[in-house]
Amino acid sequence: MKLLRKRVPQITRLMCIAIAFWVAAGFTAFADVKGTILDKEGEPIVGATVLVKGTQKGAAADLDGQFTLSGVDANATLLVSAVGYTPQEIALKGRTDITITLVEDSKVLDDVVVIGYGSLQKKQVTSSITSIKADDLAAGIGGATVGTALQGKIAGLSIDGTNSPNASSSFQLRGVGSVNAAQSPLIVIDGVPGGDIRLLAQEDIESIDVLKDASAGAIYGTRAAAGVILITTKNAKAGNVRVTYTGEFTTDFIRNKPDLLTADEYTKTVANATDWGYDTDWYDAVTRNHPFSQQHMLTLQGGTDNLSVYSSLMYKDAEGVVIGDNRKDYSGRINATYKLWDNRVEVGVRLQAREADRDQRGGEGTVGTAMRYNPTIPLMSVNEPTKWNVDEAGAGAAGGTPVSNIEYQYNNGKDQWLLGTATLKIRLYDGLNLQGSANVDRRQYQGVYYEDAKRYSSIQNNRAGYASHSFDKTTNISYDAYLSYLKEFGENREHRLDAVLGWSYWDSARETFSANNADFSINGIGPWNLGEGTYLKDGNAGMSSYKSPTNRLISFFARANYSYDDKYMASASVRREGSSKFGANNRWGTFWAVSGGWRISRESFMDDTRDWLSDLKIRVAYGVTGNNSIPTGITKPRLTNDAGGWLNSATGTFFNSYGPANNANPDLKWEEKKEFNVGLDFSLFNDRLWGKFDWYTRDIDNLLFEVDAPQPPYVSNTIWRNVGSMQNKGWEIEVGGNAIQTKDFTWTSTLNFSHNSGKIKKLGMEGQYIDGDGFPNPGNPGSPVRLSSGSPLGKFFVFRYAGVDENGNIQIYDKENNVVPATGNNINSSNRVYTGNSFPALIVAWNNTLRYRNFDFGLQLRGWFDFDVISQPSMYQGLITGTGGNNLIKNLYEENKHIKGDKVLCDYFIQDGTFVKIDAISVGYTLNTSKWNKYLQKTRLYLTLRDVARFTSYSGVNPEVNINGLQPGIEKLDGSSLYPQTIHATFGVQLTF
């Protein structure tokens, strides 16, 4: 008993402890858990499911992404999932209020690809299509335009443009597609064809899908010969209203300033140089140090299960590195969708307006002029040092100075865009939908120009100022209506049919007006009071207006995609299209395509590879598309009063004169492109690594071109004809993957390669040819481009350099390989050869995104390999004679100083332009601020450097010349390649509420 009495207190204590643990455990077992499920943008994921692992207990997230679970064990694990996101297991560890962030599923085969009038999962695609999502487009490219952001992202797509805020980008997909008709891909924005990519803000874009081959683009008919770029803008998701502000602040640093001769070096070096006694760095005079640009973007989105609204406002103020080259943009967009009657009817509206105010006094031409200008001419007036020099000390003979010509003018352009579409979608039956849209695309340009009375051109023409005012408006209207049918059938739903049948109408009309006058009594009032100038009463003022014939297209189209067991796929499309541009005999064309795919990885004999081979698919496609990109009204005779008229000064009566405007060709017909494409798609290691390979060949027949016509019998000196055929072919490789993927660190990398070559198969009659633009005076050396039957595209047509004679004059080889002087009868086309290659043998781009916890880092590299550039700066600013007194670039002069004679268009001035470029480096940090402020969900700070560095052995100014079109590879004196090369430094902040 004593022993028992001694142990009672101990037993009691043990029982109390056990009861305490039991009570605590009991309370924990019945605790409530609440939480919020968000995507990586901080937006609620409506309908996400949460299950307690090992139980049947679960909940779904509401419109705010919130959920509540009752009676959950403190050590339970939650299974969280949502469609399109990677499932997660979350250990509670006693927490009762949690925030869960899901990331999008990396299963690339389930990604949705937008195609003509519909969409497909990537695994079902049988054509060559490259897709870019919003995150991939924007990654690491702060402060960029859409065109700049696309650079290096898509194999086979080449983009040309400059750093000028007023420059536009030109696009070319898979090489040259025509000798004169449209060579740029068709831009389709939210289903509206013919869009202008300058209209869009990068933040508004949801995805970009590039249809590369004819089988993908044939359903767009006549305008898809050069490929199609489909751009889809953002829709709001159901859930709370989300507001995002993005501010970007950019400055530029000139990184590769040409080393020009100083005034002293100039007078000692350049033949017949005139020394005006001053030393002016004209390159510095026309450029700015660290111009400042800013952009502010505000987006608001939200909605319910039935209504969603996305809207945005944007303001941008950009200063160019060249004086007189500035731009301000204002943009607004609203996308709204409303579903009613149990989702059987869906109504949508998308509307965007944008305005750009452009100060376009300076630009590409300004830089070239400044680089060539005599450095001994003073910047400021000799007699009035506070004013710009206009015509003193040699400036008059040189046409005024580059600076005074900018400062003494007003040159403003205003671009206005309006893009709107209204859609109606009706679910007629399970899988059967009727959809229609009405679209408007209106663009207007207003140009206002005033030349000050103090400007050299006014002084030269003895007039007190010159003014002009112009308008140019284009309105495109289109309507679409189509039935779409989607059905899965069979015992295991192994058959899938996706079909479209529709009709389309599109028309375009253009109107222009311009007027000019000169010699105003009050300097500066001219643009806004044109009638006040004296040129009107003297009969020297000008006025013109124009209304184009309406360009109409009517189309009927159909497409069917079939797949069996996600293993065998086939697709076919056809479009019957009529164009008002052609005569009655050739007005209608039929464009069609077929393609097929085989997912070998799903075959039973591939079972042993499933642990590492996620997917392997072979694609084969063939399609025919057309091209009608020629002026309207050329198949019928027209009258014009371009000859002007005459004024009866005695009576004050003005008489118009009319005459034939063109040589009509009623037999003109469509260009036709036939394209064959073979492709291979693969993904490895549970989609950690993916890629694709494409090989293609294109044949373009019935080439449209404006050729010379003899007078007489023709009334005009040119006529449009179908002149021949051409071919291009090439290959593309795209590889990407999540190289590293851990809880805290991910590295995503993509690499693409492309190659293209082409030739003219036939061009007109025997011996006919087309020459490119001639090089400018002085010297008039001719054009380095000639197209003729059998000629390769991208080759230069020049003389062969054979050294210099004892006097330093260039010698060439004639057609018999004899060394002859480059003079007289030796300068003829029979002594020229095709040489070099202005199309890169290989274009490579490597894009990387690394994320460590809240930090992100981006690196983008791009290279053009084994291509040639012919340098106008080397010919015009590297020789001491025949330059018209141009200033020289030192390194080019050092290379060429053995040449004492005039320039000759020969292969001496061609050199390898191979380069590797760091397109962008970025670093960012994202801070989850919701824990401190319930309204501010997320803050992101980032710094981006664009156009960081270029590595090349090219000795000219810039090897990154235009490689689009029929005259590629030329570094021009006034071209985009001479616009200052700058490093763009952008600091950005993004706030999500």
Task: Kindly give the residue locations of the regions a language model identified.
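Extracellular/lumenal ectodomain signal focusing on beta-strand-rich modules
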Residues: 47, 71, 111, 131, ...
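C-terminal extracellular loops and terminal segments
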Residues: 147-151, 720-727, 769-796, 829-830, ...
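Extracellular/periplasmic, surface-exposed regions of secreted and cell-surface proteins
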Residues: 164, 184, 267, 271, ...
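Flexible glycine-rich, low-complexity coil/linker segments exposed to the extracellular/periplasmic environment
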Residues: 256-284, 375-406, 525-551, 643-663, ...
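Short Gly/aromatic-enriched secondary-structure transition segments
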Residues: 259-262, 451-453, 515-518, 766-767, ...
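Glycine-rich, aromatic-lined ligand/substrate-binding cores of catalytic
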Residues: 838-870
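C-terminal beta-barrel architecture of Gram-negative outer-membrane proteins
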Residues: 857-918
